[in-house]
Amino acid sequence: MKIQQIFNELVDLNDTNYRFHLAKPSGEYIPSEALAYSKESWLGWQVYKGNNKNRFPYPVKYIFSFAQLSGNEFIFGGIFEILDREGEEYEVKYIDKYDELIGRVILTYTGANTRGTVFRPSHILENSEINEIYKVPYKGEKFCGIENINHTYYQLKLIYDN
């Protein structure tokens, strides 16, 4: 399914106001866990400027955000408006649009750039599709049984809390 069928404002989209953020694990931090844990935890993945201190260098206003589940599958994490670019972090806020789809829409990315995390909308629209829509929002990894536990405290807390 084309992304525009779910996110209808992308039909007439140009690359000037939006960027897509496909968040990927960073060391022991896993974006899908942050998304499942809380809005505040997930917000932390949007304010980070990266090593070059400007992940969204163009004057884009909005971030379509997704968290990597595995491989080339990403789950929708919401839309954020960039309010301020000064300082050590971006100042962003959630946009209520498509709130009911947070944690439910699964995007499959098929582009050649598998290392990047920030993309122009035109690239994502050409190289991605909606693979699935969960009935209920993603709440983290399912408990796999005590004999299979090889998880961090943070992962276990997420399972326990949900």
Residue ranges of each PLM-predicted region?
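Generic detector of short, locally flexible boundary/turn motifs and exposed helical patches
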Residues: 27-30, 45
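Assembly/interface hotspot detector across virion components, adhesins/toxins, and nucleic-acid enzymes
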Residues: 60, 67, 82, 143-146
